[in-house]
From Swiss-Prot:
Cellular localization per UniProt: Cytoplasm
Function field: Specifically methylates position 2 of adenine 2503 in 23S rRNA and position 2 of adenine 37 in tRNAs.
Keyword S-adenosyl-L-methionine: yes
Gene Ontology cellular component list: cytoplasm
The entry's keywords: 4Fe-4S, Cytoplasm, Disulfide bond, Iron, Iron-sulfur, Metal-binding, Methyltransferase, rRNA processing, S-adenosyl-L-methionine, Transferase, tRNA processing
Domain Radical SAM core, chain residue ranges per copy: 95-322
Necessary cofactors: [4Fe-4S] cluster
Name the UniProt record assigns to this protein: Probable dual-specificity RNA methyltransferase RlmN
């Protein structure tokens, strides 16, 4: 069946909201989230009449085209064409002890961070909960996995999740639902540039997911140079919200910090960062800048990255360096820009919506 906006997105529904009687809903949820069915005809323990009725009313996929770009390090970037023709991206990252996906929450991003290729695209639109979830389901299908074999989700792709909070919360609830993806809350990380109102709301929802703050500078003056929209929310206001989130959820907060040469990589800034985080259960993720065409900034050399990390550790701040994966296909942190990597060959996936 061809993709059609006339069909309703079944991935928008919690398991208890799925069509059919109680036990039929459980069967449909099992097919969607445990077996990864991509067509209603695959749901062979449902009556044929029900399968046909589902196919007439609902769609299983939110994409008209999916393309995959494998990296030499084993990660894979996915480019999704949505039903309205707009595009977004996600990344699959297999590790020895876990399989992780980095999902997008928007087409483009309104934050405009200077180091981020997505920000240079500007804002397209919010993704629906179904479009967020289907990134994971489609990646699992492509990798020959059950969706439940992907046990780590980071909402760190395109977009600012807290500016699409309604749809993001719906998607996360389905990820955590025992009859859906059954993810542990501590295996879901939501990354934000720092929207205080959204952080408070996330705390009140009490989902228990991990929070990552894209801080990138310990002072407002420097941060405004890196994040043009940072003038709306002073660091003190953001930190007050973050401390509330930590107090409410008891979850350690991660602080993302992309190091830019001569901008935010001075050792005095490391000391100021340590002072800012004092008394908070926090972990700093230092991110070496991943270059992209037209970027207005330059990354800190490796020696500078290591020196900044050592200064933070000396001051008692738990710190790690995230050496990004997928750089050769534009899949690394800050590189998602809807670019088609060359000379790698596209890998179209079967079908689209209503397969």
């Amino acid at each position: 069946m061809a993709a059609s906006h006339a069909l309703k997105p079944i991935l928008e529904l919690l398991p208890e909201e799925l069509p059919g009687e109680g036990y039929r809903r459980a069967q449909i949820a099992h097919w969607l989230y445990a077996k990864g069915a991509r067509d209603f005809s695959e749901m062979t323990d449902l009556p044929k009449a029900l399968r046909e009725a589902l196919a007439r009313e609902w769609r299983l996929s939110e994409f008209s085209l999916v393309q995959a770009f494998p990296s030499q390090d084993g990660s894979v970037k996915y480019l999704f064409t949505l039903l309205d023709g707009k595009k977004t991206e996600a990344v699959y990252m297999p590790y020895e002890n876990r399989k992780t996906v980095c999902l997008s929450t928007m087409v483009g991003c309104p934050a405009g961070c200077t180091f981020c290729a997505t920000g240079a695209l500007g804002f397209g639109r919010n993704l629906t909960a179904a479009e967020i979830l289907d990134q994971l389901l489609t990646i699992a299908y492509h990798q020959g996995l059950s969706p439940r074999e992907i046990r780590n989700v980071v909402l760190m792709g395109m977009g600012e999740p807290l500016l699409n909070l309604r749809n993001v919360l719906k998607a996360v609830r389905i990820m955590l639902h025992k009859k859906a993806l059954a993810l542990s809350p501590r295996r879901v990380t939501l990354s934000t540039v720092g929207i205080p109102k959204g952080i408070y709301r996330l705390a009140e929802e009490d989902l228990g997911v991990r929070l990552a703050l894209s801080l990138h500078a310990p002072d407002d003056e420097t941060r405004r140079k890196i994040i043009p929209t940072a003038h709306r929310y002073p660091i003190a206001e953001i930190m007050e919200a973050v401390r509330h989130y930590h107090a409410k959820t008891k979850r350690r907060v991660t602080f993302e910090y992309t190091l830019l040469k001569g901008v935010n990589d001075h050792l005095w800034q490391a000391r100021l960062l340590a002072k800012l985080l004092k008394g908070l259960s926090a972990h700093v993720n230092l991110i070496p800048f991943n270059p992209w065409e037209g970027a207005p900034v330059v990354g800190t050399p490796r020696a500078g990255v290591l020196a900044f990390a050592e200064e933070l550790k000396r001051l008692g701040v738990p710190t790690s360096i995230r050496w990004s994966r997928g750089q050769d296909v534009g899949a690394a942190c800050g590189q998602l820009a809807l670019k088609v990597p060359r000379p790698l060959t596209l890998t179209p996936l079967p079908g689209g919506a209503g397969r």
